[in-house]
């Protein structure tokens, strides 16, 4: 991986009321790898929840384990962690909260159970400052898609392949 000396993004920030300003220049990375295309996918399971709740969930679970198992059955979702320090569960189900930020909407066409690395989820959760809502798109056949809709700007999507158990990895190696 090389850092380009000539290609960069520059951002200036000005606040006229407080007379504060800042300037940032981020060098773009020149990756010497092939681009991995991600096809448009119709995910069978989506979980729409508060992004601050997602951040808290990921942060708390990191103290217990390095991966989280997300299981969705019917319209209920359970996050499981288990490690040397202990174990934990967090339950979500559809609700009709008055505040949109407190609502949980689960759409499930197919029961799903997948494990993901918390190190990566914590990195992706940092985008919660850009949006109050996060949508998790889950499938046993495709990578997890974490979707933040950024008001008036667009969206930010992250993809994360599920973590394979030792049994699954050995079965795949035999094939």
Name every feature range the model reports, one short phrase each:
Residues 1-21, 43-98, 105-175:
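DNA polymerase processivity clamps
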Residues 13-38:
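Conserved loop-to-helix interface motifs that mediate assembly, gating, or partner/ligand docking
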Residues 28-32, 95-101:
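Short acidic, glycine/tyrosine-flanked loop/strand segments centered on an H-E-D-like triad
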């Amino acid at each position: 991986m090389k850092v380009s000396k000539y290609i960069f993004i520059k951002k200036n920030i000005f606040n006229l009321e407080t007379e504060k300003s800042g300037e940032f220049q981020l060098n773009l990375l020149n990756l010497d790898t092939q681009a991995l295309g991600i096809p448009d996918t119709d995910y069978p399971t989506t979980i729409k929840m508060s992004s601050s709740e997602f951040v808290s969930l990921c942060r708390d679970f990191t103290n217990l384990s390095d991966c989280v198992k997300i299981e969705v059955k019917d319209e209920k979702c359970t996050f499981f962690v288990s490690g040397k320090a202990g174990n934990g569960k967090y339950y979500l189900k559809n609700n009709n909260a008055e505040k949109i930020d407190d609502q949980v909407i689960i759409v499930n066409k197919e029961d799903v159970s997948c494990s993901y690395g918390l190190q990566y989820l914590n990195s992706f959760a940092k985008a919660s400052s850009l949006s109050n809502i996060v949508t998790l798109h889950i499938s046993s056949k495709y990578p997890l898609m974490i979707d933040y809709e950024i008001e008036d700007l667009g969206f930010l999507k992250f993809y994360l392949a599920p973590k394979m158990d030792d049994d699954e990895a050995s079965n795949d190696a035999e094939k």
